[in-house]
């Protein structure tokens, strides 16, 4: 399995770099500082979905956020390895739902980082494919409040896309960050 995965990612790297030469020459070029972003983007694994490991969001809603309600204190939240953005958007939805539940204001912002520039661009766009196989939102979240739904026609028929609303987008700032970089 790993051999196939590595082979596929090397092929992806060569495509991303528009490189047709020997892989060893490409790796030497990366070592010299060329194609570093393309290398990172080709080899990162991006696994996420909305409300992944949802007990964290329940804890945020029930134990953390009420302490900041109407306090005037700003809560700055951080989402590392945020991938395509589903988790920071889940955090933002949790803040807004908690405010409504408590009838109080919570001043919150979210910084979301990832090493992969492609997934950060995807996250900033905030447009996601939605299908019946997509993981469902928790019962306490009203997705229709936070997303616009639209149908897009493609070669295989139609697909449903959901677009994050501006209220959520304004709460999140996306940045490139390598968590293993000590500088």
Model segments located where?
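Conserved AdoMet
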Residues: 1-78
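Active-site catalytic pocket residues across diverse enzymes, especially alpha/beta-hydrolases
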Residues: 64, 68, 95-99, 127
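Conserved class I S-adenosyl-L-methionine
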Residues: 72-90, 109-111
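Extended basic-aromatic, gly/pro-enriched interface segments that bind polyanionic ligands
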Residues: 101, 106-183
């Amino acid at each position: 399995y790993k051999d196939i995965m590595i082979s596929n990612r090397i092929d992806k790297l060569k495509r991303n770099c528009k490189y047709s030469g020997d892989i060893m020459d490409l790796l030497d070029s990366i070592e010299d500082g060329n194609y570093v972003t393309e290398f990172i983007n080709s080899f990162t694994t991006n696994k996420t979905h909305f409300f992944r490991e949802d007990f964290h969001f329940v804890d945020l809603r029930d134990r953390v956020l009420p302490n900041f309600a109407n306090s005037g204190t700003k809560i700055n939240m951080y989402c590392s390895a945020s991938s395509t953005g589903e988790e920071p958007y889940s955090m933002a939805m949790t803040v807004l739902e908690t405010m409504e539940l408590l009838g109080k204001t919570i001043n919150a912002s979210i910084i979301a980082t990832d090493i992969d520039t492609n997934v950060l661009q995807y996250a900033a766009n905030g447009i996601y494919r939605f299908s019946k196989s997509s993981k469902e939102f928790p019962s306490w979240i009203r997705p229709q409040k936070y997303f616009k739904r639209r149908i897009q026609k493609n070669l295989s028929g139609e697909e449903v896309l959901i677009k994050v609303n501006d209220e959520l987008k304004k709460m999140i700032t996306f940045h490139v960050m390598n968590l293993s970089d000590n500088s």
